[in-house]
Design a protein with these regions (language model features):
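Membrane-proximal lumenal/periplasmic loop motifs of glycosylation machinery
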Residues: 100-108, 124-146, 168
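Loop-to-helix entry region of an early transmembrane alpha helix in multi-pass inner-membrane enzymes
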Residues: 138, 142, 156-180, 419-428
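Multi-pass, polyprenyl lipid-linked donor-dependent membrane glycosyltransferases
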Residues: 167-174, 198-233, 259-269, 475-480
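Membrane-interface anchor segments at the N-terminal boundary of transmembrane helices
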Residues: 43-55, 166, 384-455, 683-700
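Transmembrane-helix motifs of polytopic, lipid-linked glycan transferases
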Residues: 169-190, 228, 434-442
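Short hydrophobic/aromatic helix or loop-helix immediately within or flanking a transmembrane segment
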Residues: 115-118, 133-160
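Membrane-proximal stem/loop segments at transmembrane-domain junctions that anchor or position
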Residues: 123-127, 313-402, 613-615
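Start-transfer (signal-anchor) and selected internal transmembrane alpha helices
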Residues: 1-97, 289-300, 512, 516, ...
Length: 725
């Protein structure tokens, strides 16, 4: 390394290291995860207990990963290949099984994107209309709409009409393909199959990406573009022939531009590659010529790809004079936690032009920044970072909310019993971040290799970008493979430390491990009261049509409207909750809500007064006198009847089902069929504990056994040479 390159590597490792340390603190002190286990935001003792469990669990996960790595080291080259195939198969099965276990109702942007692509594929429309309420504001999803359109059109042409499932399978293949591409890229990048196999192992151990496969959106569809760029970049490093340089450079050019159109964050790894290429070729004439040739090919192909993409976009998109400018997202990111702000969106949606929105956004940016002190700005950025990067689940459960079919397995993945899986993901996520710190420490100390900069710069780019952009927890998904790759290499940097020959050092490691493992079990035992004795209200969704796109049903009470929704259920429930919006300025309204079973028998009925009910709950809730147990997939009829008043306090909503049928059933308003379904949820609520005492003690016993196996595995004398694999 030159002095400048060495300085740059140290600078990157220090800056990224500080950001990762901040992430580690927010991973440990994650209130949301703590509430999954305590259900009591005011119980400081129980929350501190959960924080301690996450911290110790993360450390134990690091040690457990070292034990698994040691087992992988024993395999021959053929054994590594077989294990890699098995791991890819497990990853693929988990990803695809998720879309069948959780065929969620599309929500938010995913709904708009798929709905529009299906309309185009079926020939209902042939353009992306800039006058549309959604695409008039956002043109950044045009590329994914067109990709899905061509895909859907091909399947529709051969007679496949269930295009929603086509999208889910395609999304699953994108996730699987990205992981496979990363595997081959790491083989090329490091020259060691064992490293790539360990990457696959960690990818399988963290289920967050696989469980996001039902969410058909750019965050997952862009992942194979990142993986492809990484693989081609690794090929370029090893390339010795002009043909290889041309092919890989051209592919990078295409993937960078198309990937950027799908989701702009794809460009980070391309920019990181250019920066690393500069350092790689610095003061080396032969490498400099190779880099210049590669960049020239990449630039020519990228420019051509950009013009082609621009032409396709102009062909299909009519344009809009009310698109949200970049400043809108920056201004939104400075408010609150930096999350999506519905009120701010509505404010700009009401404006007349992009120029007006841009001026208002710039004004808000200046005013907000002026209102911050350095301390409050730091707190704001810390909250943003915590929201996006501090949860090991990457918020997959937020994309599994909309369901029209209940399976008991749902409870443990995304339902009320998901707390243990969330804790597991959190501990593993903490372990990954700890291993990234090790990776960065090695980068800081290393004076010979510049390869490690590629992933570090990419991740740093993502972290910095989302400091100035709107954040959502799911937006971290495209970077999970990069985080796992860095964690894998960090783990390899320290795994041999657990098998050093010096007796005193081995005793030190043994003592430290036994202490942490024992303390972890002790904390689990001390948590028995909160897990197995403290009562909580468990709310299990059986049907949930809340997250999809809303249409208003106005004046239900004032005009004596009758809403009638049929639906099907096959498991116990005792409560209904409606997606409705309260209007405090209209306090006088009454509604009669009736639920009948398949035999037309009334099983729940109540007349609601706004003053009596809505002021307390801010929502409409129908409780059954007792739990109802349906026969197999029984049909129910839900009726909401307005009783007449001067105005409506409550505004009911229904989901637009012109292309995507959210619920099996039918909605009628005053006897007229509506192309949609009422937005409501069917639930079973009960007072219970988080986990029964026998189940919790069994879990603790399994963890103790795993700790013992890790101890036996790690502290053997034999070590394995990895240099040739």
């Amino acid at each position: 390394m030159t002095k400048f390159t060495n300085f740059f590597a140290k600078l990157i490792s220090i800056v990224l290291g500080i950001l990762i340390l901040l992430n580690i603190s927010s991973i440990i002190a994650n209130d949301k995860i703590a509430l999954f286990l305590t259900k009591n935001p005011n119980n400081t003792t129980s929350q501190l207990l959960v924080y301690s469990l996450i911290a110790l669990g993360g450390i134990l996960m690091v040690v457990g990963i070292m034990a698994l790595f040691k087992l992988i080291n024993k395999l021959s080259d053929k054994g590594l290949t077989i294990l890699a195939i098995v791991l890819i198969a497990i990853y693929s099965i988990t990803t695809i099984a998720n879309i069948f276990l959780f065929p969620t109702i599309p929500s938010s942007d995913s709904f708009y994107v798929q709905d529009y692509a299906i309309k185009m594929a079926r020939g209902d429309i042939n353009i992306i209309d800039g006058n549309d309420r959604y695409f008039g504001k956002y043109s950044n999803n045009n590329a994914v709409v067109l990709i899905l359109y061509y895909l859907f059109k091909a399947f529709f042409f051969v007679g496949q009409d269930n295009l929603l499932w086509v999208g889910r399978i395609f999304n699953s293949l994108c996730i699987i393909g990205a992981t496979v591409l990363f595997y081959f890229a790491i083989v090329k990048f490091t020259g060691k199959k064992v490293t790539a196999t360990k990457f696959l192992l960690l990818s399988v151990l963290l289920p967050s990406v696989q469980f996001s496969s039902s969410w058909v959106y750019t965050a997952t569809i862009c992942m194979p573009f990142i993986g492809g760029i990484f693989l081609c970049g690794a090929n370029l490093i090893k390339a010795t022939t002009r043909k290889s340089i041309i092919i890989n450079s051209a592919i990078i050019g295409v993937l960078s531009v198309v990937g950027y159109k799908v989701r702009p964050v794809v460009i980070f790894i391309s920019l990181a590659g250019i920066i690393c290429m500069f350092f790689w070729a610095f003061k080396d004439k032969k490498k400099l010529l190779k880099s210049a040739f590669s960049l020239a090919i990449c630039a020519v192909v990228a420019c051509t790809s950009f013009l082609v993409c621009k032409g396709i976009d102009n062909h299909y998109y009519t344009g809009s004079n009310k698109q949200f400018p970049i400043t809108h997202w920056i201004a939104m990111s400075l408010k609150g936690d930096g999350d999506y702000d519905l009120q701010y969106k509505n404010k700009h949606e009401a404006m007349n032009s992009t120029e007006e929105i841009n001026k208002d956004s710039i004004k808000d940016i200046k005013n907000t920044l002026n209102s911050y002190t350095p301390l409050t700005l730091f707190k704001h950025q810390y909250k943003k970072s915590s929201l996006m990067w501090s949860e090991g689940s990457v918020g997959y459960y937020t994309r599994q909310k909309g369901i029209n079919t209940y399976r008991s397995f749902n409870d443990y993945i995304c339902g009320p019993k998901k707390h243990m899986l969330m804790m597991y993901c959190q501990m593993l996520w903490l372990a990954f971040n700890i291993l990234i710190i090790v990776y960065l420490y090695k980068l800081f100390r290393n004076k010979s290799s510049k390869k490690g900069l590629l992933l570090a710069i990419t991740l740093l780019g993502a972290l910095v970008f989302y400091m100035i952009w709107e954040v959502k927890i799911n937006y971290a998904l495209p970077f999970v493979p990069i985080i796992i790759a860095m964690a894998t290499m960090g783990g390899i940097s320290i795994e041999n430390k657990f098998a050093v020959p010096e007796l005193t050092t081995k005793k030190y490691y043994k003592t430290a491990y036994i202490t942490v493992a024992t303390l972890f079990i002790a904390l689990l035992l001390s948590n028995i009261y909160y897990v197995s004795y403290s009562q909580v209200i468990r709310k299990t969704p059986k049907i949930e049509n809340f997250a999809s796109v809303s249409n208003e049903i106005n004046n239900v009470s004032q005009h004596n409207k009758v809403l009638k929704q049929t639906f099907y259920a096959d498991s116990d429930f005792n409560k209904l909750s409606f997606f409705s919006i309260a209007h405090p300025d209209n306090p006088s309204s009454k509604y009669k809500i009736t639920l009948k079973n398949s035999k037309k028998k009334v099983i729940a009925e109540k007349t609601y007064s706004s003053h009596y009910t809505f002021e307390k709950t801010k929502n409409v809730i129908l409780k059954l006198p007792k739990t109802y147990s349906p026969t197999h997939n029984e049909k129910f009829t839900l009726t909401i009847k307005g009783l007449g008043a001067d105005s409506d306090y409550q505004e009911f909503n229904y989901s637009d089902s012109s292309q995507i049928d959210c619920l099996p059933g039918e909605l009628k308003i005053n006897g007229k069929p509506i192309n949609g379904d009422l937005k409501f949820g069917l639930f079973y609520t009960e007072r219970t504990t988080l986990m029964s005492l026998p189940a919790y003690l069994t879990l603790i016993a399994i963890i103790a056994l795993a700790e013992a196996l890790v101890y036996i595995s790690l502290f053997k004398k034999k070590n394995y040479n990895l240099t040739k694999r």
